[in-house]
Amino acid sequence: MSRYPAAIDSALVGTYPAHTKSGGGYFYDDVLEFRVWCRPWQGAPDEFDGEIYYYAFATYEQAKAFSDVTAGSEQPLVLVRQREWIDEPVSNQFIHKRGERLTEWLVEWLLDGKREEQSIELFMRQGGGL
């Protein structure tokens, strides 16, 4: 059993936009895919005229296995969907946001970041403490 949840819909893995937000939000609603970014100038195969590119996977284990054997690749990141999140425009100023936001996260943030019904309310009541 994995420490991390798999993509919510494996049929959609690889169809999400490459350019998304990066980090932030404190909470996530859905795991969309795990990404391994490849850099040709660091030894990855040059598949896109020297440009950075990624491979998408449904599980962390698939992404990690690929990353471990692919020269010039980064450690896996996870693409998450946020329907509600915390914006922190300046340090310790927290704003509850709603909508749909796609963002890449460090995989380990999944361990404590799944949004439950009261997660954001509790976060705000505690002044930003988790």
Question: Which role fits each region the language model picked out?
Answer:
Residues 1-51, 55, 120, 124-125, ...:
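ADP-ribose/NAD+-binding catalytic cleft of ART/PARP-like enzymes
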Residues 9, 29-30, 46-49, 68, ...:
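Acidic-enriched, low-complexity/disordered segments with a strong bias for Aspartate over Glutamate
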Residues 30-32, 73-81:
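Short beta-strand micro-motifs in enzyme catalytic cores
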Residues 39-41, 60, 82-85:
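Generic structural motif
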Residues 49-73:
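A short, charged, amphipathic alpha-helix used as a generic interaction element across diverse proteins
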Residues 79-130:
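Active-site and NAD+-binding cores of ADP-ribose-processing enzymes
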